[in-house]
């Protein structure tokens, strides 16, 4: 039967060291156009999400990750130990399923970049063309990963620097030159526009995109066990991450909002739209470089998608190891890839992609539904995380843990309740149609989102109810937790949501 090897961890991770291995989550270039649709109030939304949601998630997850015996297994272990195995299975399943849907807006971004490079608008506008191209890209990337993940982290590292970091800094630099030149700005930036118009509920829907940009921090919480002084350094690391996310996302989103009017922003190709306008203003003689930058962005997001294909399935593998999934899901190929889990996830992505692209028109509505669906699925896992933490505080205060939220029981409960209420607010708002979706499309938006969500919501509970868990999945596989000392090169350039939490050891070979 598969086993989990406990590994000793040197307590030598500093504040800056923890920040460095988590910082990849603050770069979300493909979300900048969505941020930009809220104008200057995007800064308000980033602050709101950071203070009321990101910090509570990080603090609650860190305390749960340092409870004796809970150090490995992530949200599955935390929720299982507080709410029971059914809910633990559901929580990790929602993390697995949100990745399946989260691939869709990333693929839309890829197609937006390709349409600019190839000068082929149908690739970003025609639903059938868009569907076929996205499916080809998705499964082609998957095939590259079935051969093993030996080079995945290195590819992610190159993609992060060349395809995400470099274009982001070029975007910001061009926007600064544009602003300094006195060119017209598409938004007003003052105290009045800092706050969104709360009388228009549709303007608040964009908040889900900001919550999505903060999601995944709980995946790095296990590394708190490696910190030399977690009580002092971890809260500071969370603040640094929040400040970095707010600064980078604000500047990136505003770079687009200043140049492209909100009602003209294409959510899939908005970054390329902006580069075109900026380059034609700053250096029209080298406007051809927009296609080069688009190619860099394309490669960056392709590398990101490729690196996300196997990691979450390896995380889900722990449930197959505990026989919470049928034995077929515990099967590995010779390269240490849980093929059944990976293929199942990609089938879900493909079905959702076909439905959303062709019923949503393949335009901004498809992008927004995919984004909102990703968020509401993932929020279900966070509901359980916060409720599990409240149970831990109220019923198990005696359990030893390395990190405690400072301030005692009252502060702990306030932090968890604030995070839970913010999650509930984001969940409700997600089902409201945005302002840029009008007429009959609003009904279609809500219907597609609600039906899709209910189907995904039911999957883990149906599977748990019908599967006979009496047998044992005999896989001959050992799981070795990954930490800051034994991680493969480039591992920490992956977004925390996409990282495999452990090595797969088969026949004395580590994958």
Swiss-Prot record:
GO terms for biological process: amino acid transport. Residues 1-14, 63-93, 149-157, 222-239, 313-335, 388-412, 467-511 are cytoplasmic. Residues 36-41, 115-127, 179-200, 261-291, 357-366, 434-445 are periplasmic. Keywords: Amino-acid transport, Antiport, Cell inner membrane, Cell membrane, Membrane, Transmembrane, Transmembrane helix, Transport, Virulence. It is found in: Cell inner membrane. InterPro entries: AA/rel_permease1 (IPR002293), APC_superfamily (IPR050367), Glu_antiport (IPR004759). It is a multi-pass membrane protein. GO terms for molecular function: antiporter activity. GO terms for cellular component: plasma membrane. The keyword Membrane applies. It comes from the Bacteria. The chain crosses the membrane at residues 15-35, 42-62, 94-114, 128-148, 158-178, 201-221, 240-260, 292-312, 336-356, 367-387, 413-433, 446-466. It catalyses: 4-aminobutanoate(in) + L-glutamate(out) = 4-aminobutanoate(out) + L-glutamate(in). Shows pH-dependent activity. The glutamate analog L-trans-pyrrolidine-2,4-dicarboxylic acid (L-PDC) blocks the uptake of glutamate by selective inhibition. The keyword ATP-binding does not apply. Belongs to the amino acid-polyamine-organocation (APC) superfamily. Glutamate:GABA antiporter (GGA) (TC 2.A.3.7) family. NCBIfam families: 2A0307_GadC. Involved in glutaminase-dependent acid resistance. Exchanges extracellular glutamate (Glu) for intracellular gamma-aminobutyric acid (GABA) under acidic conditions. The ability to survive the extremely acidic conditions of the stomach is essential for successful colonization of the host by commensal and pathogenic bacteria. This is Glutamate/gamma-aminobutyrate antiporter. It comes from Escherichia coli O157:H7.
């Amino acid at each position: 039967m598969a086993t989990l090897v406990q590994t000793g961890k040197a307590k030598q991770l500093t504040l800056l060291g923890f920040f460095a291995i988590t910082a990849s989550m603050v770069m979300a270039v493909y979300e900048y156009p969505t941020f930009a649709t809220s104008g200057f109030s995007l800064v308000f939304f980033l602050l709101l999400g950071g203070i009321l949601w990101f910090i509570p998630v990080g603090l609650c997850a860190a305390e749960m990750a340092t409870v004796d015996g809970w150090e490995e297994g992530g949200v599955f272990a935390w929720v299982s130990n507080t709410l029971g195995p059914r809910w633990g299975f559901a929580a990790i399943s929602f993390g697995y399923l949100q990745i399946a849907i989260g691939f869709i807006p990333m693929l839309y971004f890829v197609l937006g970049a390709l349409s600019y490079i190839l000068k082929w608008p149908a690739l970003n506008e025609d639903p059938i063309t868009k569907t076929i191209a996205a499916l080809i890209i998705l499964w082609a990337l998957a095939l590259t990963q079935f051969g093993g993940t030996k080079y995945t982290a290195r590819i992610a590292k190159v993609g992060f620097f060349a395809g995400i970091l470099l274009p982001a800094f070029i975007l910001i630099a061009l926007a600064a030159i544009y602003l300094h030149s006195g060119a017209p700005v598409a938004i007003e930036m003052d105290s009045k526009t800092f706050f969104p118009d709360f009388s228009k509920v549709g303007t608040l829907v964009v908040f889900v995109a900001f919550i999505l940009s903060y999601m995944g921090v709980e995946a790095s919480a296990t590394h708190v066990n490696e910190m030399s002084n977690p009580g002092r350094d971890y809260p500071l690391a969370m603040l640094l991450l929040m400040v970095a996310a707010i600064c980078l996302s604000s500047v990136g989103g505003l770079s687009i909002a200043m140049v492209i009017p909100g009602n003209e922003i294409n959510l899939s190709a908005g970054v390329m739209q902006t580069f075109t306008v900026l380059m034609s203003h700053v250096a029209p003689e080298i406007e051809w470089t927009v296609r080069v930058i688009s190619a860099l962005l394309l490669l960056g997001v392709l590398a990101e998608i490729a690196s996300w294909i196997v990691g979450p399935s390896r995380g889900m593998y722990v449930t197959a190891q505990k026989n919470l999934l049928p034995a077929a899901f515990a099967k590995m190929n010779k390269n240490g890839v849980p093929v059944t889990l990976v293929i199942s996830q990609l089938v879900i992505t493909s079905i959702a992609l076909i439905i959303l692209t062709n019923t949503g028109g393949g335009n901004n509505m498809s992008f927004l539904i995919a984004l909102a669906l990703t968020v509401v699925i993932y929020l279900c896992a966070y509901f359980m995380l916060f409720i599990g933490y409240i149970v831990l505080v109220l019923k198990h205060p005696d359990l030893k843990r390395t990190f405690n939220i400072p301030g005692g029981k009252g502060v702990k409960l306030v932090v968890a309740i604030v995070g839970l209420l913010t999650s509930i607010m984001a969940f409700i708002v997600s089902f409201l149609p945005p302002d840029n979706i009008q007429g009959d499309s609003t009904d279609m938006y809500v219907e597609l989102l609600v039906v899709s969500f209910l189907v995904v919501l039911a999957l883990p509970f149906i599977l748990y109810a019908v599967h006979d868990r009496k047998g044992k999945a005999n896989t001959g596989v050992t799981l070795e937790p990954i930490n800051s000392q034994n991680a493969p090169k480039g591992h920490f350039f992956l977004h925390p949501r996409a990282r495999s939490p452990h090595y797969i050891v088969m026949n004395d070979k580590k994958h």
